[in-house]
């Protein structure tokens, strides 16, 4: 069974940089699973920042959806997988759904997808480590629209599910990682 580490924090908290540091320190081959899609210039810039920080020898997979299969395949040959990030992946899932949003259906969809990611990690060799990066979106103000509130709630549930299954959990605040599990 592979090892699972969850790294959470707010926007620009340093969580990705910390997860990248853990991946580099692993000493083995690293696979980077990118979940973001560039829909506008600002997102293109964010993706470029992440891409420029990564070592050139890391293998990158673009997986905006159906990432469990990518984890299964990559984890058989590589010692460390960095999945960045869960909350972007979650937004990709939600964007596929049509309005009106059925909260129970979306909760089941998210729970099922998180279970698939967890099962993929559990099926890996024990020497494989998967680092999941996620955003802590529930610590701010209550969003003004229904979809944003639903996203916040589903992200919180997804993070809880991943944290419960993780071997270690880090919260990154102001660039400082704190191990909370």
Where are these regions (language model features)?
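Residue-level signal for inorganic ion chemistry
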Residues: 19, 50, 82, 135, ...
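Charged, low-complexity C-terminal accessory regions
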Residues: 1-15, 23, 29, 160-181
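Residues at the starts of beta-strands that form the adenosine-phosphate
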Residues: 28-31, 79, 129, 168
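Structured helix-beta-strand junction loops
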Residues: 26, 56-57, 77, 124-127, ...
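Conserved P-loop
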Residues: 5-75
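Catalytic phosphate/metal-binding cores of nucleic-acid and nucleotide-processing enzymes, i.e., regions
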Residues: 1-2, 76-77, 108
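A basic- and aromatic-enriched beta-loop-alpha substructure that forms the phosphate/nucleotide-
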Residues: 80-94
């Amino acid at each position: 069974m592979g090892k699972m580490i969850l790294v959470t924090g707010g926007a620009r908290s340093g969580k990705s940089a910390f997860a990248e540091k853990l991946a580099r320190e692993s000493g083995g081959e690293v696979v980077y699973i990118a979940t973001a899609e560039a829909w506008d210039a600002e997102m293109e810039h964010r993706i470029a920042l992440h891409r420029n920080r990564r070592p050139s020898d890391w293998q990158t997979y673009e997986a905006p959806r159906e990432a469990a299969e990518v984890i299964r395949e990559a984890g058989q040959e590589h010692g460390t997988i960095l999945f960045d990030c869960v909350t972007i992946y979650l937004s990709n899932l939600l964007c596929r759904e049509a309005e009106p949003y059925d909260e129970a259906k979306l909760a089941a969809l998210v729970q099922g997808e998180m279970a698939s990611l967890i099962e993929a990690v559990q099926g890996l060799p024990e020497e494989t480590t998967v680092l999941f990066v996620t955003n802590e979106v529930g610590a701010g103000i209550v969003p003004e629209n229904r979809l944003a509130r639903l996203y916040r709630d589903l992200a919180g549930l997804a993070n809880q599910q991943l944290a419960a299954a993780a071997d270690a959990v880090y919260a990154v605040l102001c660039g400082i990682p704190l191990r909370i599990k």
